[in-house]
């Protein structure tokens, strides 16, 4: 199962996808390369991320 998160910034709106079984520190990158983020926490009984690392970057 994969899940998708959508982040919005001043410059771009982009989806991040991840496997529900992914490592808590799994590195994620969107399909266009616009931005990237690192997962900091995955919930045990939910299908969405509860937290994303502050390292989110956009051009």
Swiss-Prot record:
Keywords for the protein's UniProt record, in alphabetical order: Host cytoplasm, Host-virus interaction, Modulation of host cell apoptosis by virus
Cited InterPro entries: Circovirus2_Orf4 (IPR009757)
GO CC entries: host cell cytoplasm
Any one of the GO BP annotations: symbiont-mediated activation of host apoptosis
Protein localization: Host cytoplasm
Entry coiled-coil feature ranges: none
Pfam families tied to this protein: Circovir2_Orf4
Role summary: Antagonizes host cell apoptosis by interacting with host ferritin heavy chain. The ORF4 protein physically binds host FHC, resulting in the reduction of FHC protein levels in host cells. Reduction of FHC concentration further inhibits the accumulation of reactive oxygen in host cells, leading to reduced apoptosis.
Assembly notes: Interacts with host FTH1. May interact with host ANT3.
Name of the featured protein: Anti-apoptotic ORF4 protein
Organism: Porcine circovirus 2 (PCV2)
């Amino acid at each position: 199962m994969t899940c998708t998160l959508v982040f919005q910034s001043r410059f771009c709106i982009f989806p991040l996808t991840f496997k529900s079984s992914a490592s808590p520190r799994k590195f994620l990158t969107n399909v266009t390369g616009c931005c990237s983020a690192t997962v900091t926490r995955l919930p045990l009984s939910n299908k969405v991320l509860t937290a994303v690392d502050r390292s989110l970057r956009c051009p």
